[in-house]
């Protein structure tokens, strides 16, 4: 990946995968564009900007003048350019979750809030989104207030759930995700059996889309428990309750799991709803000092209500500012 700096000072990340077996960036772009439509409600999704193709090597660092807009945006066109694609997403100026899992202070004070934010989103969108490759390297940690704590208020609960956390987790890499609304009709029967699809149909992404338990054409409410497997230190007791890979062939256990729609919490964690319940019980108590307030109004789509989240700066001491209040998207 490469950092891109625009003439106006804005920044982005250019993803240029290499090697056989890579995911198809056209599909990742299609998934990202759909998820962009949910970012005003669920801030855990990274902003997807553009997908490009190039004819020859881009160089190192890449020459942006060699990139061309990849249109039309469909799987067929994605096949034709599979080995020469680049994806531009918004930059997150923060570490990955993986790099923080050895930090005892993070484990004690922030991990519960980070995981709650992720699994709240996964639970609320359990019929619309499954990541299918959710692990700690695919979570980036953003802080829009310079590393200071923020108060998170989730108003879907009565009374609202409140906790303080220093990070807004951003889910990245949608190349194997199920996202409701993407048209994949004829992907296997037509697109991946055409000469234009080679080598993509065998090496660059589309063949990974239809495993026994991993299918980007449908949701799986258990698949994204992978993130909770083998958590360190004081979180090991929660990981021990996670059932991931149960009744799945050993060689596939690392990547996929059988779906369990009926929850088993508190005895076991078998789906994202169980995970949310377990994480709710681990949230830290509210603190008095925070630099900003996140109000999350996201609710399941079935009830017809989805309010935009709000981000408001706070006064010193953790109270809401009476002046210069502003709401913005992060």
Predicted regions and their residues:
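Short coil/turn segments at secondary-structure boundaries
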Residues: 15-17, 60-64, 100-104, 182-187, ...
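Conserved structural core of kinase catalytic domains
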Residues: 43-108
């Amino acid at each position: 990946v490469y950092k891109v700096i625009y003439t106006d000072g804005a920044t982005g990340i250019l993803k240029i995968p290499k090697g056989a077996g890579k995911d198809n960036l056209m599909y990742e772009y299609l998934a990202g564009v759909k998820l962009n439509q949910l970012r005003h409600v669920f801030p855990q999704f990274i902003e997807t900007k553009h997908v490009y193709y190039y004819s020859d090597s881009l160089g190192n660092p890449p020459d942006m003048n060699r990139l061309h807009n990849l249109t039309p945006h469909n799987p067929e066109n994605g096949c034709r350019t599979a080995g020469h694609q680049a994806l531009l997403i918004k930059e997150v100026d923060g570490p990955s979750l993986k790099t923080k899992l050895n930090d005892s202070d993070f484990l004690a004070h922030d991990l519960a809030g980070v995981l709650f934010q992720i699994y709240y989103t996964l639970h609320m969108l359990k019929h619309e989104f499954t990541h299918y490759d959710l692990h700690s390297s695919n979570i980036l940690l953003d802080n829009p207030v310079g590393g200071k704590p923020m108060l998170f208020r989730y108003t879907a609960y009565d009374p609202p759930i409140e906790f303080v956390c220093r990070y807004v987790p951003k889910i990245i890499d949608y190349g194997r995700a199920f996202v409701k609304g993407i048209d994949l009709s004829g992907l296997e029967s037509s697109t991946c059996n055409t000469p234009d699809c080679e080598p993509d149909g065998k090496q660059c992404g589309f063949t990974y889309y239809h495993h026994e338990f991993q299918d980007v054409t449908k949701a799986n409410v258990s698949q994204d428990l992978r993130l909770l497997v083998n958590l360190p230190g004081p979180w090991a007791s929660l990981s021990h309750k996670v059932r991931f890979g149960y009744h799945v062939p050993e060689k596939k256990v690392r990547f996929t799991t059988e779906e369990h729609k009926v929850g088993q919490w508190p005895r076991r964690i078998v789906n994202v709803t169980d995970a949310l319940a377990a994480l709710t019980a681990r949230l830290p108590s509210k603190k008095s000092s925070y630099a900003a307030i996140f109000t999350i109004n996201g609710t399941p789509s079935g009830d017809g209500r989805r309010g935009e989240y709000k981000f408001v700066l706070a006064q010193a001491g953790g109270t809401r500012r009476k002046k210069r209040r502003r709401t913005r998207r992060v």
